[in-house]
Swiss-Prot record:
EC number: 1.7.2.2
Amino-acid positions noted as binding heme c 3 in the UniProt annotation, renumbered to this chain: H94, C209, C212, H213
Signal peptide span: 1-26
Name of the protein in its database record: Cytochrome c-552
InterPro entries xref list: Cyt_c552, Cyt_c_NO2Rdtase_formate-dep, Multihaem_cyt_sf
Pathway connected to this protein: Nitrogen metabolism; nitrate reduction (assimilation)
Domain of life: Bacteria
Database matches in PANTHER family: CYTOCHROME C-552 (PTHR30633:SF0), CYTOCHROME C-552 RESPIRATORY NITRITE REDUCTASE (PTHR30633)
Cofactor note: Binds 1 Ca(2+) ion per monomer. Binds 5 heme c groups covalently per monomer.
Annotated localization: Periplasm
UniProt: heme c 2 binding residues: C160, C163, H164, H301
Binding site residues for Ca(2+): E215, Y216, K261, Q263
Gene: nrfA
Length: 478
């Protein structure tokens, strides 16, 4: 019998290419991992994060609707020709995000997916279903079309997956795992030198809020959301950017001025204020750490007024008592409101005086410098007042913006007086009675009875169809 001598080293050397080839081949042919679908139903995460979920759910207690147009009818004139002249309520709890955008008169009464005045982008800050659709269809797919197209898809209120990477193992273990669920927000943060992945924990906390509490506009044919920060975040920087690209949100129906509508620029105003400069974040003031019944600390998701949790918020830094700080804040708020009203009065007159000049035959060339002043004045006013907490976030910046708005409005009216005189008009232009919201809306020609009736029909007929379809598709809990 012949004995065979086995050279182990030789065999191993022959097998190495085989193993290497097999390994590489397996790597190349393995199917790519399927991305985890964003789970938009907030109640899914209640078992893992019960305290956070219940406190988030408690935002439903912030249910009061405050009619800002009824409080200040001048707004109707300033927004003439724009949906905000129909309806503008002050913000309430996150639990009403979807309900409020459905029921506001601004979104109209569409009969089908291709109908209505507004684009899909108007859903963008209302629901984790937005993140789900962007992941599923891409940004172009999500933004395409009218607002009504999203009705059966966007059904869960702003919640967990808007701010957290809920699919991550760390989130399942109880970690926050913050994320920017809106890609356009991530690009904007990168544009100002703040890539989210490289930001510290405190920066990330405010950046997450800044996905929505921010100024933005609808860009291009697809009306995609973009933040106007290319030239900087101050009011003049954004104004310059908008002028450079010749953007306007609408044309005021009285003065025919191409206007800008500020949204809710809390991130920009917070950045400009003392809290932002010292990295006191949105979370520190609006979502403090509190104790549950067992004494365990958790982040309170009932986002609200810091004075409601004074010991856990303001008192962490300030030595003054609650009453003293409330007095300071109230005085700042009053100062801003007083100047706000003065600017609005100037702008109301400017819009009606511009209308009189146009009616008297003023040319486009004659009106251009006047309309530029009106546009810039109202933009600066709007950026100040659209940030509801500016008296707390950046009162000095708020007063500065309103001061420059007053100057611009005065410039417009001075030019208008000269132009009107060349048309033989030297008397004061009369302003109609706008002492109530209803009278102001009548003055700009709105048929509010018809608008409200159409909306009520939409609420009764279309919204139930959306919800039924969402339940059938498993997007909404039964």
């Amino acid at each position: 019998m012949t004995r065979i001598k086995i050279n182990a080293r030789r065999i191993f050397s022959l097998l190495i290419p085989f193993f290497f080839f097999t390994s590489v081949h397996a790597e190349q042919t393995a199917a790519p991992a399927k991305p985890v679908t964003v789970e938009a139903k907030n109640e899914t995460f209640a078992p893992q994060h019960p305290d956070q979920y219940l406190s988030w759910k408690a935002t439903s207690e912030q249910s009061e609707r405050v009619d800002a147009l009824a409080e200040d009818p001048r707004l109707v004139i300033l927004w003439a020709g724009y949906p905000f002249s129909r309806d503008y309520n002050k913000p309430r709890g996150h639990a009403f995000a979807v309900t409020d955008v459905r029921e506001t008169l601004r979104t109209g009464a569409p009969k089908n997916a291709e109908d209505g005045p507004l684009p899909m982008a108007c859903w963008s800050c209302k629901s984790p279903d937005v993140a789900r659709l962007i992941q599923k269809d891409g940004e172009d797919g999500y933004f395409h079309g009218k607002w009504a197209r999203g009705g059966p898809e966007i059904v869960n209120n702003l919640g967990c997956a808007d701010c957290h990477n809920t699919a991550s193992p760390e989130f399942a273990k109880g970690k926050p795992e913050l994320t920017l669920s809106r890609p356009y927000a991530a690009r904007a943060m990168e544009a100002i030198g703040k890539p989210f992945e490289k930001a510290g924990r405190f920066d990330q906390q405010s950046m997450v809020c800044g996905q929505c509490h921010v100024e933005y506009y609808f860009d291009g044919k697809n009306k995609a959301v973009k933040f106007p920060w290319d030239d900087g975040m101050k009011v003049e920087n954004m104004e310059q950017y908008y002028d450079k690209i010749a953007f306007s949100d609408w044309t005021n129906s009285l003065s025919k001025t191409p206007m800008l509508k500020a949204q809710h620029p809390e991130y920009e105003t917070w950045t400009a204020g003392i809290h932002g400069k010292n990295n006191v974040t949105c979370i520190d003031c609006h979502m403090p750490k509190v104790q549950n019944a067992e004494g365990k600390l958790y982040t309170d998701h009932k986002i609200g007024n810091p004075f409601d949790n004074f010991a856990q918020t303001c008192a962490n830094c300030h030595t003054q008592d609650k009453a003293a700080l409330q007095k300071v804040v109230a005085e700042r708020k009053q100062s801003i409101n007083d100047l706000k009203i003065k600017v609005e009065d100037q702008l109301v007159h400017a819009h009606f005086e511009a209308k009189a000049a146009l009616d008297a035959g003023a040319t486009e060339a004659e009106m251009k410098p006047i309309q530029d002043d009106i546009r810039h004045a109202q933009w600066r006013w709007d950026l100040a007042i659209a940030s509801h907490g500016i008296h707390m976030h950046a009162p000095e910046e708020g007063l500065r913006m309103l001061g420059t708005a007053m100057d611009k409005a005065a410039d417009a009216r001075t030019k208008l007086a000269r132009l009107l005189a060349t048309k033989g008009i030297t008397h004061e232009i009369q302003i109609p009675d706008i002492s109530t919201k209803e009278k102001a809306q009548q003055a700009i020609g709105l048929n509010m009875e018809q608008i409200k009736a159409e909306k009520q029909d939409f609420i009764k007929t279309v919204i139930p169809q959306w919800e039924e379809q969402a339940r059938k598709n498993g997007l909404l809990s039964q």
